[in-house]
A protein has these predicted regions:
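Metabolite-binding pocket within alpha/beta catalytic cores that recognizes anionic/polar moieties
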Residues: 13-99
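Single conserved hydrophobic/aromatic residue that forms the stacking wall/gate
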Residues: 1-12
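A charged, well-structured terminal subsegment
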Residues: 215-224
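Proline-aspartate-enriched helix->loop->beta-strand connector
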Residues: 153-167, 183
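Short glycine-rich anion-binding loops that position phosphate/pyrophosphate groups of nucleotides
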Residues: 43-44, 165-169, 192
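Short, flexible loop segments at boundaries between secondary-structure elements
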Residues: 139-143, 182-214
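A short, gly/pro- and small-residue-rich
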Residues: 55-61, 171-193
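Conserved beta-alpha
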Residues: 73-145, 152, 156
Length: 224
């Protein structure tokens, strides 16, 4: 993939941060009660930003973009082994939600249908069983839905909005409602691929178990 100059500027500003550095920056902003917006960005989102002015504005206004597609790193010539592994395993997502769980932060989940929002909640609780899901809401095409969702969110007044909306709905909702939402942090996860495969962490655990099983089998065989 080749990135345009605008695409490079949009994603390269944060791609040099390690996950640890990003988390420290976000923690600092949260402790200072500064409204913070984070978006996971993949190649499709960047392509949309080229053709849709509102998506472009929304992404440019985000405080942090998290690269969700290692192809972006390669195209932006910012590819390092550490960053590639962090992106493959979605380390920021995992470490950030571990912090939310540990600190008992109120999380409001949004998606494009009741089925999608239920699946997103199940996905999060499957990984972070003590995560505090304080509310969930749907953004679809029905009249007044956007205003109703803003009201639902503000009644809960969550620490974090976790958005699983697809692009461009996610970026447009944030662009038009950022100033109205009572929240500390917006995390636009979108429909990035790790929703389907859970998280690299699970894969790591499985690999570790496989290695242990293999070691056990070898030891058993050797001691016969």
């Amino acid at each position: 993939h080749l990135l345009s100059r605008r695409q490079r500027q949009m994603c390269i500003r944060d791609s040099n941060y390690t996950v640890r550095e990003m988390l420290m920056r976000v923690d600092r902003r949260i402790s200072e009660k500064i409204l913070t917006t984070i978006e996971e960005v993949n190649m499709d989102t960047l392509a949309l930003a080229e053709s849709d002015e509102e998506v472009k504005q929304s992404l440019e206004a985000c405080d942090y973009t998290v690269i969700a597609d290692e192809g972006i790193l390669r195209a932006a010539s910012a590819d390092t082994l550490q960053r590639r592994h962090e992106i493959e395993d979605h380390d920021f997502f995992y470490e950030f939600f571990k912090r939310l769980e540990r600190n008992d932060k109120k999380i409001f989940v949004i998606a494009e249908s009741q089925k999608a929002v239920d699946e997103a909640e199940e996905f999060l609780l499957g990984l972070f069983d003590r995560a505090r899901i304080s509310g969930k809401g749907v953004l679809d095409d029905s009249p007044g839905c956007s205003e109703n969702l803003v009201n639902e969110i503000n009644i809960v007044s969550p620490d974090v909005i976790a958005s699983f909306l697809p692009s461009p709905s996610q970026e447009k909702f944030l662009l038009h409602n950022r100033e109205k939402l009572l929240m500390n942090l917006w995390y636009g996860i979108g429909n990035n691929k790790f929703m389907g495969k859970k998280h690299g962490f699970i894969g790591k655990i499985r690999k570790m178990l496989d290695v242990k099983r293999l070691t056990h089998l070898i030891n058993t065989y050797e001691h016969r």
